Amino acid sequence: GLTVTVRGFQEPYSFDGYDLVIMGPGPGNPTEIGQPKIGHLHLAIRSLLSERRPFLAVCLSHQVLSLCLGLDLQRRQEPNQGVQKQIDLFGAAERVGFYNTFAARALQDRIEIPEVGPIEISRDRETGEVHALRGPRFASMQFHPESVLTREGPRIIADLLRHALVERRP
């Protein structure tokens, strides 16, 4: 079986000795770097990226990752709170649950970030809202895969975990 360790941002921890890190969903405003939790989340994600440690990011941490990668992040006109949508998740139609006030936006399906590598972007073609990201050693999602509104949550998590755990060279 798996061994899981849960740590709050204010607790001492190290990423050493773990096969995978899961960065949590929030709540919080991803742009308020002066807030201890948010500032810490930015530092942790930058560390995971630079050290190429496998990680999965959900909701708030997906938004912070998006900012760290240089994507545009905006407050939504109307928050998604318990909203189920069908999306294109890297070529597969999925019904997922959203609970977000902020959303990253992108105009393309793939970007190249120096020092990180190629990043695939799952997004709404009309609005540009980013649903998920896949890059070398990481995956992230704006929606909540653990929500009852996400029809195939365990499978989606498994697919994205497999992606994050496979070594890919930039």
Regions of interest found by a model, annotated:
Residues 2, 8-11, 105-109, 170:
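General structural signal for secondary-structure boundaries
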Residues 157-170:
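Short, hydrophobic alpha-helical segments
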Residues 1-56, 69:
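Flexible gly/pro-rich beta->alpha loop and the following alpha-helix that scaffold active-site loops
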Residues 43-47, 54-58, 63-155, 163:
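Pocket-forming structural segment of enzyme catalytic cores
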